[in-house]
Regions:
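Pyridoxal 5′-phosphate
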Residues: 1-404
């Protein structure tokens, strides 16, 4: 286990106050804070190695290119992908899923074909498929879940038909914290000859991910949720699929040759990386991945699950408490309501106590519909959170509850 005080010292923002109270930051599911090493690495590149990548023979361009491609290799190692060519840089998980939805559907799907998703998906893993459904006449099938937030795997198996072309599911629910059995989901899909995209936005920051062990065909995650910069994300895809998928966008760098008669495209991964990439952000992402790797993903997972269990137990002591997402082994997310108190009121008053949580539907309205509610209060943990901060949350919830 790591020294939590030393870790917190790496994040300057955690020492600030809000409304003259110590900041208790429990909104890591939305975005994480950044360690000094990430901020310093990005500043250093802008100061001393800022130039466009893949486009210049001069020193600065070569240096920036080396850092950018080294970041790709860092990502490959972090998720244990077989090849660097299978690592595509995007703007985030949302763009990664949109890329797959648009390109895969163009290559492999026709009117009447089907996509399987789950009821607990983030809107970013629903809307891209709906856009394709409206354009191409394909259909979405939905895996239901029980009252604890666990997917119904029996129904999942029954959803497959000869029209099923892809499955796209969250590794971890951003609202419930449910850790889905993605290896089993992939195994079943592959028995039907169907590829699987895994949304790893809420898993990659919290425990070790091995895409070869999962055997998923696509995997997406975001930099800003794993202590890296905003605006950078990753799509891993098996070469056998990516090679057969058309480019998602057109522009510079993704071409091999251009004439007014015909354009030919670059090989992987550049075929899917049109335009100037955010090469400073890729360096920042790599620095963040090295930071969490040094702490140990198993250590981070153990720390955060201890916090999650502790928070669930403490909140359950409060009269009128309703906890959403109660599956065993859930990860780093606690969603709740208290009595008839509106989630926005609870979140607003907690904020006045210096406690940052998220309120609302968390970009997962079908989850709210499943439980017959409009929204929840969500506390989500990161590697720097403490039991004392959980205690502050519990005390804050009790104090707010007494106002109603």
């Amino acid at each position: 286990m790591y020294d939590i005080n030393k870790v917190r010292a790496d994040f300057p923002i955690l020492s600030r106050t809000v409304y003259d109270r110590p900041l208790v930051y429990l909104d890591n599911g939305a975005t994480t804070q950044k360690p000094l090493c990430v901020l310093d690495a990005m500043r250093e590149e802008y100061l001393n190695a800022n130039a466009n990548v893949h486009r210049g023979v001069h020193y600065l361009s070569q240096r920036a290119t080396d850092l950018h491609e080294a970041a790709r290799e860092t990502v490959r190692q972090f998720i244990n992908a077989p090849k660097t060519e299978e690592i595509i840089f995007t703007r985030g998980t949302t763009e990664s899923i949109n890329l797959v939805a648009a390109s895969f559907c163009e290559a492999f799907m026709a009117e009447g074909d089907e996509v399987i998703v789950s009821v607990m998906e983030h809107h970013s893993n629903i809307v891209p498929w709906q856009l394709q459904a409206a354009k191409r006449g394909i259909a979405l099938k939905v895996i239901p879940m029980d009252d604890s937030g666990k997917l119904d795997m029996q129904v999942y198996e029954q959803l497959f038909s000869e029209k099923t072309k892809i499955v796209s599911v969250a590794h971890v629910s951003n609202t419930l914290g449910t850790v889905n059995p993605v290896k089993e989901i992939v195994r079943i899909a592959h028995e039907h000859g169907v590829p699987v995209l895994v949304d790893g936005a809420q898993s990659t920051p919290h425990f070790a991910v091995d895409v070869q062990s999962i055997d998923c065909d696509f995997f997406a995650f975001s930099g800003h949720k794993i202590y890296g910069p905003t605006g950078i994300g990753v799509l891993y895809g098996k070469e056998e699929w990516l090679d057969r998928m058309p480019p998602y966008q057109g522009g510079g760098e993704m071409i091999e040759s251009v004439s007014f008669e015909k354009t030919t495209f670059e090989k992987l991964p550049f075929k899917f990386e049109a335009g100037t990439p955010d090469y400073v952000a890729t360096h920042g992402l790599a620095t963040a991945l090295n930071y969490v790797s040094a702490l140990g993903m198993d250590n981070i997972a153990a720390h955060e699950r201890e916090l999650t269990d502790y928070c669930m137990a403490r909140l359950a002591e409060i009269d009128g408490m309703r906890l959403f997402g109660t599956t065993e082994g859930k990860d780093a997310v606690v969603s709740f309501l208290v009595g008839d108190i509106h989630h926005l009121d609870m979140g607003t008053l907690l904020d006045r106590l210096g406690i940052a949580v998220r309120t609302g539907h968390h970009c997962a309205q079908p989850v709210m519909d499943r439980f017959g509610i409009q929204g929840t209060v969500r506390a989500s943990f990161g590697l720097y959170n403490t039991k004392e901060e959980v205690d502050a949350l519990v005390a804050g919830v009790k104090r707010v509850s007494q106002m109603f």
